Regions:
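Secreted/periplasmic carbohydrate-active enzymes, especially glycoside hydrolases
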Residues: 1-168
Length: 168
């Protein structure tokens, strides 16, 4: 029953324990940092303009500056916010697809917010000190499944291939 010729469940996958890819540990400020950040990049207006929805959890008195650069290094978005969620629009984006995987660089500047002087409310003077920068790669695309077909940016995609498990 359990000889070499019998079917073994998950025979196409070598189950290893431990870390299988490169891993990094980052030291961050305990009192002022980003605990979690997520973003969803999509397309609108006939796939011409991009949207980026950002949701974050921070601790401490933190403000975040978002800077989005295209491949050529041009700044296409610069915004600062202390809100937990933000939605930004980027005009005339390059679409990401399998043939042209165009990626933008999103830099998330974590800034400590400090009130300076005796002013209160809107009259208070605030200083921002950057305590860290977190980089991300962002691709603007819409992916959907319609029936049994996969669509990327309004174009049907035909997949060929088989399982692939990365084992060195």
């Amino acid at each position: 029953r359990l000889c070499d010729g019998t079917y073994c469940e998950d025979q196409d996958f070598w189950r290893l324990s431990g870390v299988a890819r490169q891993s990094y540990l980052y030291k961050r400020n305990k009192t002022t940092n980003v605990n979690d950040i997520r973003f969803i990049a999509g397309l609108k207006n006939d796939y011409k303009d991009g949207t980026i929805f950002i949701k974050k959890e921070t601790n401490g008195n933190v403000a975040i500056r978002y800077r989005l650069y295209d491949k050529e290094g041009n700044l296409v978005l610069d915004a600062t916010s202390a809100d937990k969620q933000n939605l930004y629009e980027v005009k005339n984006v390059h679409q990401w697809n399998a043939e042209n995987p165009y990626l933008y660089t999103l830099l998330v500047d974590v800034m400590r917010k400090e009130v300076v002087g005796k002013g209160k409310g809107k009259n208070a003077k605030v200083n921002y000190t950057t305590v860290g920068v977190i980089p991300f790669k962002v691709g603007f695309r819409n992916v959907s499944i319609q029936g049994s077909q996969v669509w990327v940016n309004g174009q049907h995609v035909f997949f060929k291939g088989a399982n692939r498990h990365e084992v060195d």
